Every structure is written in structure tokens, then in C-alpha cells.
């Protein structure tokens, strides 16, 4: 079941590799928040991210910067991962994809994320910037 948290942030951990994927993740779980996503942002700060749910894939049309994209299954298992996806691309489209995590470029490599890894969502204190 998708985690719904309209205020504050979550952090995401890679249980398979015992790494922290992201300390400050905003959840886009309404029609409008999923539609807007990262549009209008100039950058994605290291340690931050956007979890879009539900989602079977994302596009980077109109984006101003490249991002790393992680496609997640129903139980937050990694079903796809793409590094440094530039503007005007589509990624993650799959029947297996239920959620999509957008990260700063290079975060997939830093957090050692690979297909099959199990990610864990953890409540974090404080509000998202």
C-alpha cells in the first residue's frame, strides 16, 4: 500500500545494501503534485528526492536538469534504474512499476542501487524544503 504523508518528509534506505538513498524525500501523491513533479525547479539538492506514487513511469519534458530515476514495484523493490536522464525523456514505463523515485544525478551510483534491491521508507522529522 502506498505511504501517504502530506506534511514533512521521509527518508529512503536501501535495505539490501545497507545504504541511505535519500535523507529528505517529498511525496507526490495527489494528481496536481504528480503532474507538477520537479517542473520549475532549477536543481535537485544532494540528499533530496521526489517519490511519485502511484506512478507507472515518468517523463522529463520541460525539466531544466538531468536526474536519476528509480522505478519501484508494489513493495518498493527496484524494478528499473536510469542514471543522468536528461530533459525530454520517458523512463520507467512498465507493468511492474508502481512508484517512481526521482533523485539528483549520481545518487544511484552513490547509494549502490541496482535492480532487485529492496528499499524502505522511513518517517523523517522536519518539513521538506
Whereabouts are the PLM-identified features?
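Compact, glycine-rich, soluble single-domain proteins
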Residues: 1-129
Amino acid at each position: 500500500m502506498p505511504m501517504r504523508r502530506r506534511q514533512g518528509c521521509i527518508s529512503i534506505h536501501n535495505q539490501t545494501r545497507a545504504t541511505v538513498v535519500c535523507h529528505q524525500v517529498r511525496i507526490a501523491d495527489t494528481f496536481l503534485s504528480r503532474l507538477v513533479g520537479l517542473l520549475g525547479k532549477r536543481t535537485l539538492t544532494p540528499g533530496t528526492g521526489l517519490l511519485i506514487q502511484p506512478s507507472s513511469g515518468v517523463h522529463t519534458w520541460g525539466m531544466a536538469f538531468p536526474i536519476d530515476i528509480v522505478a519501484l514495484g508494489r513493495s518498493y523493490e527496484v524494478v528499473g534504474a536510469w542514471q543522468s536522464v536528461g530533459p525530454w525523456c520517458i523512463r520507467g514505463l512498465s507493468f511492474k512499476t508502481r512508484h517512481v523515485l526521482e533523485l539528483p544525478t549520481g545518487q544511484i551510483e552513490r547509494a549502490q542501487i541496482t535492480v532487485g534491491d529492496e528499499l524502505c521508507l522511513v518517517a523523517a522529522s522536519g518539513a521538506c524544503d
